[in-house]
Amino acid sequence: MPANPELLISPKQRQGGGYEQLAADFLQQQGLRLIARNWQQPKVGEIDLVLIEHGRSWNVLVFAEVRKRKLLGYGDALASITRSKQKKLIKTARYFLRHHPEYADFECRFDVVGFTERTGRSGQGEPLQSEWLQGAFLAPAW
């Protein structure tokens, strides 16, 4: 094993991990409980964060996608979740539920946590704007 496994991670992956950590921290501050991070089903896809939101009457399993955008010319971070990406996330979530039958009775929800860096007049990046979109898209019947 390499002495420094971070060397095997691209700068983009390292940066993405930082935003995933920001999102995980934020969602946990909102009362959600993190149960999985970067959950993968080979040849299908990956889910950035899997969390549980405990309600009074029921629990919700939250599959969260974390996005970061630098330029608004292409839309904000939330706009980057295409229909194709939604289908991939839904398919991966189904595999997650097959691997974790203990969550079979939970309601499921797909959220997006988006970070957008705004570029100021100086050309320098300004503080990130974050947005949490609960129920960002719906899955067909499970």
UniProtKB/Swiss-Prot annotation:
GO MF term (any one): nucleic acid binding
Alphabetical list of InterPro entries matching this protein: Restrct_endonuc-II-like (IPR011335), tRNA_endonuc-like_dom_sf (IPR011856), UPF0102_YraN-like (IPR003509)
SUPFAM superfamilies with a match to the protein in the record: Restriction endonuclease-like (SSF52980)
Pfam families per the UniProt record, alphabetical: UPF0102
Similarity field: Belongs to the UPF0102 family.
NCBIfam families: PRK12497.1-3, PRK14687.1, YraN family protein
PANTHER family assigned: UPF0102 PROTEIN YRAN (PTHR34039:SF1)
Protein name, entry field: UPF0102 protein PsycPRwf_0497
Protein's organism: Psychrobacter sp. (strain PRwf-1)
